[in-house]
A protein has these predicted regions:
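Pore- and pathway-forming membrane helices of multi-pass small-molecule/ion transporters and channels
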Residues: 1-15, 25-33, 50-93, 97-109, ...
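Conserved mid-sequence domains
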Residues: 242-347
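Hydrophobic alpha-helix feature that most strongly marks membrane-spanning transmembrane helices
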Residues: 305, 321, 325, 329, ...
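Membrane-spanning helices that line or support transport/gating and their immediate boundary helices
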Residues: 109, 113-117, 312, 316, ...
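Hydrophobic alpha-helical segments that drive targeting, anchoring, or assembly
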Residues: 7-27, 31-38, 43-44, 48, ...
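Cytosolic regulatory and coupling regions of membrane transport/channel systems
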Residues: 93-100, 109-288, 407-517
Length: 517
């Protein structure tokens, strides 16, 4: 089961990146499970098991945050390792369990990567469609909020295309659509309603299975420069990503994000203390499954304490309602083994469908599924299961949030200051690149967009911390406005037109005369 849960990761990534990411998830799952099984086979002292569970949860939280792996984050890894800690084991059984985990992980890898044989550019299509919709919202309702959302969506689409591997005709068309979405948010003579409807129409066609629609060319040859400059820029950036020096720099950045002074460390410390406190409280009260409290506490921690408080309420409500659902379906699940399997499959599907849309509704489905899994070994008294689950949920939520409140994250303000400096530097580079070759200009614009996205994320994280020194909110606002003005000015600067890169065999699109070789 542990290996199969790896299939929950990487759904928004292009298949080339997804294959590598899922391989890493399988290895991380196996490593965490191995540490838990070895610990469980060597000792039965609850205090040691809880300490190891809390330490594993903190390491998994820090690793997932540093790599930005996305949902479901560390929660699934913590669920598996914590449950394994409290399962009776013998040391000789561990290799077989790990081999089964790797085998199931390989199946999960095939399931998640296999659709590439049918729809190779599916993730890229969805990312580009989201960028087009965000651009349409920006055109229809100009304002700081929609501008930030459009910038973030366009940046995410570019990153998805950069990670997709070698260019194909479809990806070339998708790149043109993203460049078109980026250019569409600048002022134009087109009626906003008509332009927004056109962008939404392009988004709907992009999500489909048919050919990717190419935006209509501008009326003049010279106006081609804005959009097609981006194609040369992404070619140059894709080539830079293959540079071994760039990869080494990325690894060093990852290590720095886990080193002293990192804003991720306070959240990892919260996870360590909260999970340990929750486990020890449940053990002291004689609850039979302290790992439930550990998982509950681990699932609460978000980027700041405000989001953690919201997640605490959602998790508690969802788990308590989920216990009621479990009590209702338990008699049905015990009629036949097939009924138990079907119930687990149903709640697993419901959890996958709901949890990204509404967390507490997803928790309503996850809770009965987790309780029903225990029935595969042997039936348990319903009252005991329900009582333990309710107590673990309440204690885990209380202990987890208490740790979040006690461990402050004053480094969040420092992250904002660093983001302000990076944004100012990126804006200066973008302004200087206005007279440079198109590839450099496009790359500088994307770097500025990335810095603006990082600045907004850092500011939102810092403002959600309850105990924090005064934040430079006016400086953040001024930096965002200046960055948006620079993006608009550079997007409006057309370049000379000449031979374009090929998008499909025998055809070309107009593009600037200087490209990335």
């Amino acid at each position: 089961m542990a290996g199969s849960l790896c299939a929950l990761y990487g759904h928004g990534l292009p298949y080339a990146r997804r294959a590598r990411t899922l391989a890493g998830v399988v290895l991380a799952m196996t490593a965490g499970l191995g540490a838990a099984l070895v610990t469980a086979s060597l000792t039965h002292f609850t205090a040691v098991l809880v300490a190891v569970g809390a330490l594993l949860a903190a390491v998994q939280k820090a690793g997932c945050d540093a790599t930005r792996i996305g949902p479901p984050g560390h929660v699934i890894l913590t669920f598996v390792s914590s449950a394994a800690l409290f399962a009776p084991q013998r040391l000789g059984q561990v290799p077989a369990h790990l081999a089964l985990t790797l085998a199931a992980g390989a199946v999960a890898w095939l399931v998640c990567v296999g659709p590439a044989l049918i729809r190779r550019e599916g993730p890229e299509r969805r990312a580009v469609a989201r960028a087009l919709v965000a651009a349409a919202d920006r055109v229809a309702d100009p304002g700081p909020r929609t501008h930030r959302a459009a910038a973030a969506a366009v940046h995410a689409a570019w990153q998805c295309l950069l990670a997709s591997g070698r260019p194909t005709p479809v990806r070339r068309s998708l790149e043109r659509l993203v460049a078109h979405a980026e250019a569409a948010v600048t002022p134009s003579d087109t009626a906003p309603e008509a332009e927004a409807d056109r962008l939404r129409g392009l988004a709907a066609q992009t999500r489909g299975r048919g050919p990717v629609s190419v935006p209509p060319p501008p009326g003049s040859q010279g106006a081609y420069g804005t959009e097609y400059t981006e194609l040369y820029g992404i070619d140059a950036e894709r080539a830079a990503l293959r540079d071994p020096g760039r990869r080494r720099a990325a690894r060093r950045a990852l290590l720095r994000s886990l080193g002293p002074g990192s804003p991720l460390l306070p959240v990892a410390v919260r996870t360590l203390i909260g999970c340990g406190l929750a486990g020890y409280l449940c053990a002291a009260l004689g609850v039979g499954r302290p790992y439930w409290a550990i998982v509950t506490a681990a699932s609460l921690y978000q980027a700041n304490i405000t989001l953690t408080w919201n997640r605490t309420l959602q998790r508690t409500l969802g788990n308590l309602l989920g216990v009621l659902v479990f009590a209702a379906v338990l008699p049905l699940s015990r009629t036949t083994p097939l009924a138990l399997v079907l119930c687990c499959l149903f709640f697993g599907f419901a959890a996958e469908a709901l949890i990204t849309r509404n967390y507490w509704l997803g928790s309503v489905a996850v809770t009965p599924m987790a309780l029903l899994v225990l029935e595969f070994g042997a039936p348990h008294p319903a009252g005991e299961l329900i009582g333990d689950r309710v107590l673990d949920t309440v204690l885990g939520a209380l202990a987890g949030f208490l740790a979040a409140a006690l461990v402050t994250n004053r480094r969040a303000a420092g992250r904002v200051e660093r983001a302000l400096e990076a944004t100012a530097k990126a804006r200066t580079e973008a302004e200087r690149a206005a007279g440079r070759p198109p590839a450099e200009r496009a790359r500088a614009r994307r770097a500025l967009t990335a810095s603006l996205v990082e600045l907004r994320e850092a500011a939102d994280t810092a403002v959600g911390e309850w105990w924090q020194r005064a934040l430079p909110e006016q400086e953040v606002l001024a930096a965002e406005q200046a960055g948006h003005r620079t993006l608009t000015a550079t997007a409006q600067r057309p370049g000379p037109a000449a031979r374009a890169p090929e998008t499909r065999r025998g055809t070309t699109v107009p593009a600037p005369s200087i490209g990335a070789e």
